[in-house]
């Protein structure tokens, strides 16, 4: 992995969301790649239950500001970034007020899936692709997890 550029895309990641199999694997795999000399960047949604202040997220103005079309509607794309403590790995957060402001990831308090999870997933995927283009960074490997 030495010198390889790896784009790691995940729906969940420790320490930003509670620990589970997906969030922990999405932390450990990039950490190992990074420690072996890979150049890794992680992308995940900026769910409303992620504490921006505690995790020091900040908006990247040069990457934000475009709209993505989802179901014939223009939806603003906001990009935020933070670093995983002690790992020197950048995490890019795909954000949109309509899709990600609620204080949960996939389900409501009763355990019901949000009816727009499909639109949220499409917005996230499009947001990752557009942001990588704007970064002018071409990964050698793209890994999508969770």
Tell what function each PLM region has:
Residues 42, 46-134:
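A conserved catalytic-core segment of Leloir-type glycosyltransferases
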Residues 1-19, 44-47:
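Nucleotide-activated donor-dependent transferases that construct or modify glycoconjugates
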Residues 134-140:
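Short, surface-exposed connector motifs at secondary-structure boundaries
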